[in-house]
Amino acid sequence: GAQVIIDQFIASGERKWSRASGLVLLLPHGYEGQGPEHSSARLERFLQLCGQENLQVLNCTTPANYFHALRRQIHRDFRKPLIIMTPKSLLRHKSCVSNLDDFSKKNSFHRILEDHALNNKNGFISLKKSGSIEKVIICSGKIYFDLLEAREKAKNDKIIIFRIEQLYPFPAKSLAKALKPYAKNARFIWCQEEPKNMGAWFSVRDYIQWTLDNIKASSNIVSYIGRDVAAS
C-alpha cells in the first residue's frame, strides 16, 4: 500500500501539483540476519524514482551526520522529501560514534565521509600516502564498518574507503575532489552488501564513472564487488 503513496504523491507531488513536502521516512535497511523481509527498504526503488531533484536519499553512518541531516531538513528554505536508510545494528556499533563537537553549529551535514584511518586519533592503521594507495573502495551505509574491520584485520595499508552519505542528489563534484589524489595509481571499486540488482549500484555507477573521467583516472572503469543478482 505504501508504494502507491510514495510513487503517486511523495515522489511526484511537487512536479504534478506544485505541492512541496518535507516528509522524512526512516526505513530499516541492512543485512542483519533477520531475513529478506527485514533486510531491505528497497533502496533501489527509491533511487529509480529520483529525478529533477525531487527526493533526498541518505544512508548515514554517524550520529552527527544523521543529526545534521534532520537539522538541515528543518532549516532549509525549501521542502523536499527525505528518505533515510537506518540499519539497526549501527545503534550499538562501537565505531559508529561522534564527538560532541561534531553536533555543534561549526559542523554540518557531510555528503561524503572519509576513511577513519585518515584521522590518526582514531587508533586505526596508518595508510600509505595517496600515491601508494592501490585500491579505493566506495560504499554507502553500514557495510563501511564491515570493510573497515576486514582491512584492520588484514593490516592492509594500501586500501582506502570512502562513504557516500547522500545517494541523491549525488555529490559527484565532492567525490571527484576526494578521489583526485588517487587518480594515478589506484583501482576504483564500488562495494555493497545488497545483491547486484538491488541497492545503489545501478544508480551510482554512471555518476562514479563521470567522476573518474573528470579526474582523468588511469584506471577509469569502476568495478563492482558484492552479491550476485538475487530474487530476494
Model-derived segments and spans:
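Generic structural signal for well-ordered alpha-helical scaffold segments
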Residues: I10, E14, R71, A176-K180
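Thiamine diphosphate
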Residues: G1-G22, P28-Q48, H68, R76-R79, R92-S232
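Extended catalytic/binding region for NAD+/ADP-ribose chemistry, centered on the ART fold
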Residues: G1, Q56-T61
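Short glycine-enriched loop/turn motifs at secondary-structure junctions
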Residues: G51-Q52
